[in-house]
Amino acid sequence: MAGKPGIQLFVIFLLLSSFAAVVWAMDNMPADKDVSKLFPLTLIHINDLHARFDETNMKSNACTAKDQCIAGIARVYQKIQDLLKEYKSKNAIYLNAGDNFQGTLWYNLLRWQVTADFITKLKPTAMTLGNHEFDHTPKGLAPYLAELDKAGIPTLVANLVMNDDPDLKSSKIQKSIKVTVGGKTIGIIGVLYDKTHEIAQTGKVTLSNAVETVKREAAALKKDKVDIIVVLSHCSYDEDKKIAKEAGQDIDVIVGAHSHSFLYSKESNKPYDQKDKIEGPYPTIVESNNKRKIPIVQAKSFGKYVGRLTLYFDNEGEVKHWEGYPEFIDNKVKQDPKILEALIPWRKKVQEIGSTKVGETTIELDRDSCRDKECTLGVLYADAFADHYTNSSFRPFAIIQAGNFRNPIKVGKITNGDIIEAAPFGSTADLIRLKGDNLWAVAEHSLALDDENRTNCLQVSGLRIVIDPSKSVGSRVVKIDVMDNRNPKSEDLKPLDRNAEYFIALPSYLADGKDGFSAMKEATARWTGPLDSDVFKSYVEKIKKVDKLKLDRVIVCKAGSPCT
């Protein structure tokens, strides 16, 4: 850019303007600490619990005897009760921002039942849904919603469009609620990431634009004489900043989720895990288009922190001061004895089912590298899918998106728990017939960055993909070679015929065109198979031991090297 000051200034202007709305904040209290003439509202909040019912280690994985155990639902419950009591005089309410489903064997085996048991014990003032609440379709969500309703817990998603979904037609999801605390009426609006229907198994359900929905619902609440409006969002830190900027004329604060963002102000000098990356201050203050200051909070994930923010409002309903921080749920936090007792029967079920041996492996089945390149877990999983449909005269390819995987499998015995936790989303192992040109488009899309700046590298069986990441978007797939679907005895590879049709085994999630894999919708035929975990389990039982895998199925060319 040397010699082009005009361009430099323009780029600097763009950078500054993109951050101008965000104020990096810490506690904002008057020097004399006198807030006696202001109305206090305290928000106690958690998000993205992801089935961490049992205590965890510092990395939010299962805690072992060697670890320092933290978090867990018994500690979270105790901390919430303590905060509700401590801040009762400051009008405390407790909010849950969604994604309580998915993430451990507890959910994989016990689904909505165990989740409902503990969420109803915590009993938030209100909660919204996360995208993972749809992991087992609306049918898997409906009984959970019914239990929340029985417990008197309102579920709020203002931008949820039912589209006559048969499983949710009797659910009592609301756009917003009004609660009265300290003589003031508080409106709470729930909102879910508006592309959830593209990344989750939502059935007929879709999501409307989050910003426009919040604007509309907030205006209606203001017209109804609500004093303060809280947005309970499962949209991500970045999306929440957008909501604050563009819909900030009527809302007062956003309690967020989805991005697992750790917001913290070091000036608070409060304890935290110093290995947790700080993404912004707690609270983050965004200036709206009409110059109002909108605080945003989020409490990372996995029950590792419980957020507590106290806001002070003037008579005009404007936030004048605030203070608070995420409370670290370390091992100094006591565990509630009643919750500990309630965990015992559930834990017994998890241990009994999860510890059964299925097979063994002499190599680590890696998950961490799956997003960027071929990984051993992905290769084994793809082989299992292909094997399920293979017979003496037929063998399909198999492709699995990297986002399908959640946990690696370590060297040693492979258990039921390992099988389920490796890919816990409950997809079916389907078979489709797809044109070669569409398969090429799918391979190209796997290299595109998602909203978290990640690729979704395909894990494959029966084909070989060569990728040149130095090329432009849309031209990164150099070649695809494939085996013959009709000759399972031959492992010879031939160039993909982009006009021919091929048979491909894949997860139903991918076959549905989720995660932007829209070319999958061009399939000319589709057959629904059994649960993916059952297919994976059967394959591991069949081969008994994983001791070697044929790799180099996805070749990522290195800079300066031939790409063939």
Curated annotation (Swiss-Prot):
<feature type="site" description="Transition state stabilizer">
    <location>
        <position position="132"/>
    </location>
</feature>
<dbReference type="GO" id="GO:0005576">
    <property type="term" value="C:extracellular region"/>
</dbReference>
<keyword id="KW-0067">ATP-binding</keyword>
<dbReference type="InterPro" id="IPR008334">
    <property type="entry name" value="5'-Nucleotdase_C"/>
</dbReference>
<keyword id="KW-0800">Toxin</keyword>
<keyword id="KW-1201">Platelet aggregation inhibiting toxin</keyword>
<feature type="binding site">
    <location>
        <position position="50"/>
    </location>
    <ligand>
        <name>a divalent metal cation 1</name>
    </ligand>
</feature>
<feature type="binding site">
    <location>
        <position position="425"/>
    </location>
    <ligand>
        <name>AMP</name>
    </ligand>
</feature>
<feature type="binding site">
    <location>
        <position position="406"/>
    </location>
    <ligand>
        <name>AMP</name>
    </ligand>
</feature>
<feature type="binding site">
    <location>
        <position position="99"/>
    </location>
    <ligand>
        <name>a divalent metal cation 1</name>
    </ligand>
</feature>
<keyword id="KW-1199">Hemostasis impairing toxin</keyword>
<keyword id="KW-0378">Hydrolase</keyword>
<dbReference type="InterPro" id="IPR006179">
    <property type="entry name" value="5_nucleotidase/apyrase"/>
</dbReference>
<dbReference type="GO" id="GO:0008253">
    <property type="term" value="F:5'-nucleotidase activity"/>
</dbReference>
<dbReference type="GO" id="GO:0005886">
    <property type="term" value="C:plasma membrane"/>
</dbReference>
<comment type="function">
    <text>Facilitates hematophagy by inhibiting ADP-dependent platelet aggregation in the host. Cleaves adenosine triphosphate (ATP) and adenosine diphosphate (ADP) to adenosine monophosphate (AMP) and inorganic phosphate. May reduce probing time by facilitating the speed of locating blood.</text>
</comment>
<dbReference type="GO" id="GO:0046872">
    <property type="term" value="F:metal ion binding"/>
</dbReference>
<feature type="site" description="Transition state stabilizer">
    <location>
        <position position="135"/>
    </location>
</feature>
<feature type="binding site">
    <location>
        <position position="99"/>
    </location>
    <ligand>
        <name>a divalent metal cation 2</name>
    </ligand>
</feature>
<feature type="binding site">
    <location>
        <position position="234"/>
    </location>
    <ligand>
        <name>a divalent metal cation 2</name>
    </ligand>
</feature>
<dbReference type="Pfam" id="PF00149">
    <property type="entry name" value="Metallophos"/>
</dbReference>
<dbReference type="GO" id="GO:0090729">
    <property type="term" value="F:toxin activity"/>
</dbReference>
<keyword id="KW-0964">Secreted</keyword>
<feature type="binding site">
    <location>
        <position position="131"/>
    </location>
    <ligand>
        <name>a divalent metal cation 2</name>
    </ligand>
</feature>
<keyword id="KW-0020">Allergen</keyword>
<comment type="similarity">
    <text>Belongs to the 5'-nucleotidase family.</text>
</comment>
<feature type="binding site">
    <location>
        <position position="48"/>
    </location>
    <ligand>
        <name>a divalent metal cation 1</name>
    </ligand>
</feature>
<dbReference type="InterPro" id="IPR029052">
    <property type="entry name" value="Metallo-depent_PP-like"/>
</dbReference>
<keyword id="KW-0325">Glycoprotein</keyword>
<keyword id="KW-0732">Signal</keyword>
<keyword id="KW-0547">Nucleotide-binding</keyword>
<keyword id="KW-0479">Metal-binding</keyword>
<feature type="binding site">
    <location>
        <position position="258"/>
    </location>
    <ligand>
        <name>a divalent metal cation 2</name>
    </ligand>
</feature>
<dbReference type="GO" id="GO:0006196">
    <property type="term" value="P:AMP catabolic process"/>
</dbReference>
<protein>
    <recommendedName>
        <fullName>Apyrase</fullName>
        <ecNumber>3.6.1.5</ecNumber>
    </recommendedName>
</protein>
<dbReference type="InterPro" id="IPR036907">
    <property type="entry name" value="5'-Nucleotdase_C_sf"/>
</dbReference>
<dbReference type="GO" id="GO:0004050">
    <property type="term" value="F:apyrase activity"/>
</dbReference>
<dbReference type="InterPro" id="IPR004843">
    <property type="entry name" value="Calcineurin-like_PHP_ApaH"/>
</dbReference>
<feature type="binding site">
    <location>
        <position position="371"/>
    </location>
    <ligand>
        <name>AMP</name>
    </ligand>
</feature>
<feature type="signal peptide">
    <location>
        <begin position="1"/>
        <end position="25"/>
    </location>
</feature>
<feature type="binding site">
    <location>
        <position position="515"/>
    </location>
    <ligand>
        <name>AMP</name>
    </ligand>
</feature>
<dbReference type="InterPro" id="IPR006146">
    <property type="entry name" value="5'-Nucleotdase_CS"/>
</dbReference>
